[in-house]
Amino acid sequence: MKIIDFDELYSDKPHIVLVLGYFDVFHLGHKLLLEYAKKEAEKLNAIFAVFTFSNDISSYTDKTEPIYNFEKRKKLFALLGVQLLITAKMDQSFKSMSASEFSAKLKEKYNIKEIVVGMDFKFGKNRESDFNVLREEGFVVEVMSLLKDKHDNIINTTDIKKLIKSGNIKEVNEQLTFTYSVSIRNCIEGSNGEILADIDTNLKNGNYICALECYDKHSSEFPCTIKDSKVLFKKSVLGGIIANNKLDDAELYILREVNRKEKNS
């Protein structure tokens, strides 16, 4: 996957099928967008591209802090087959850019075969414009329907963040493209054979079943305790998969809450 800055100029203006979105978490609705765009790019002999922001945009929009940082999002975009990632930094200048200005920049830089967005897509100054403006500007635009969960509610990032905060990790994972995970850092080995580490999450304090991935090695499932953005688990669960307990590059997958049987075992 190639990563470029939105301000870069290209002499060859590559032909692309472009998905527009922030993607601070990859839920099933996002997966639908990306899979459709990938197939369209293959059909049109074009590059499968995504435009997104590389920084936390919560200071400039009504969005809350992202679930996944940019480093993790880059990895997930690559796993989904994105060939070209076009990134911009949200700032006051970009926030003030009109929809027409943004559209003109897209036309200037790329040969866009098709743009793919969700039904709820908004852009431009104060997010006042939608996909109809893109069509008025001459783009071919595919608007994807919004997916619903088992409760007949539209799957969206805001509700997923609420589910994380409430500890309903089962429903979180049902709505995500990838199992919910957090990066581990600042690991400390305790005297009783336990590992304590920091994690970036506002997941409800509690006991969960987790798994670790580090340097392409995977652990078995194990119980852990999450409290105040820290995780505690027994060192023995590593089973020798991680040399020298270097866990600062590890990913902790949070699979489900501990059930009654697991609590008593």
Question: What residues fall within each predicted segment?
Answer:
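Phosphate/ribose-recognition catalytic cores of enzymes acting on nucleotide-derived substrates
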Residues: V182, I188-S265
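General small-molecule cofactor/ligand-binding pocket signal
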Residues: K2-I4, L85-A88, E142-M144
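N-terminal catalytic cores of NTP/NDP-binding nucleotidyl/phosphoryl-transfer enzymes
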Residues: D5-N69
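Classical nucleotidyltransferase
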Residues: S96-L196, N259-N264
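Glycine-rich, highly charged phosphate/nucleotide-binding loops
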Residues: E65-R73, F94-S103
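A generic structural signal for well-ordered alpha-helical segments
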Residues: A41, F77, L134-G138
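A glycine-rich helix N-cap at a beta->alpha junction
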Residues: K72-I86
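Residues at the starts of beta-strands that form the adenosine-phosphate
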Residues: N45-A49, Q83-L84, V140
